[in-house]
Amino acid sequence: MSRTLLPISLLALGLQACGAPEPAPAPEPESEVAEDPVRTADPFKRGLTEADFPRIQELAPGVYSYEQLRAAGEELFTTVSMFVVTDEGVLVADGQGNFEETALMVEEIGKITDQPISHVVICSDHGDHTAGNGAFPEGVEYIVHENSVAAMERIRERIPEIPMPETVMSDRMDLTLGGRAIEILFLGRAHTGGDLVVHLPEESVLFLTEAYLHRVYPAMRSAYPTEWVAMLRRAQEIGARVNVPGHGFVDSPEVLRDELQVAIEALETVIAESTRLHEMGLTPEEADEQADFGDLETWSLRESQRGMALRRVYMELNGELP
């Protein structure tokens, strides 16, 4: 039987936080991630309820994914963060979408470790991953790609409590934290202009933030469509055992690997169909009425993202992207 990702028992974590001098080992997890889950980002179609969140899973020793629900209109889906616990502090990859949800994540991290949060990597500069950054404790080092600085400044104009990152990187940053090697990489423009990924080479875990949307309709508001495909192919070449999405569910390593390819093919479908309609001379509005994106029409966020994705491909074809 292949290794699966195991949910943390939140009850056990709460007991660990009660201050016992030598806490007992956590009990065995109550359940495992399904070997072949329903392939959807809709929590209700998976038989989950709001009470099942946040979900925390240990991907490798001391490496955790954190899934919380967020709403887009009437739809609910997950926003995923990752955190790495070391003897010298905790690194968090992506916050959540508001102060309360990020504060809850900080609280849950505190149930797992007494180590302080030392680093926050802004992997996506979108507000659903950064608008709660003011909830992180003082003294945190924020890391951002140079292409995302302007976006963070715009968010801070709306939410002054958000700290501006002091560490600005370009292509690569290597950290050693508590003996762990952590690679922060820019693999190219994708969902945004400054997507960063966090790679743990020894644990073979790769956090792909919003560049990897697991059964969520390709969201292209600020994307670079064909560059996005190329970026994800470079991510595949890393060959990580666990590929963690920024939205959608954290499933078994095998499912996540397969679904990364599905996500690439979803992008290619949007690009190909939009290009076909563009070559017919249709306006974006006319194209939106005629477009057929196949199975993607059933994916989460189709209603809000379909037309936007088509228009973004048109912009790329017209040479209008920055």
Feature map (PLM): residue ranges:
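Metallo-beta-lactamase
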Residues: 53, 58, 147-188, 192-194, ...
